[in-house]
Amino acid sequence: MDLREMSTPALAYLGDCVLELCVREYLVESGLSTSRNLNREALNFVRASAQAEAMKKLFPILTEEEEAFFRRGRNIGHTNVPKNATVSDYRTATGMEVLFGYLHVSGQKERINELFRAAYLQDAE
């Protein structure tokens, strides 16, 4: 399937899962072991505000094609924005999810790992 023809909400749906898996793998590898601690810490990564902040770190290193997929996601017309997120953060987070969905579907696992590290782990290392 041509990625340009794949629905943007479908890419966001997949990207949400990809990001969640990256976060879960990182947290388990970091030594957290109870589901309560894992779930609480995961929220620090997957909240719309956290994803919007993470995207600021990614913009300088995105390719043109990656930027295009991000914009595609950011520009989805949202009708339901969670009450704990701003419209801007939610749109940016959706763009990030579409970006990671695109990378997953196109088989770019190393790029997913690279961007995840740059977005969330750069300051921690």
Regions found by a protein language model. Give the residues of each.
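Double-stranded RNA-binding/processing signature
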Residues: 1-125
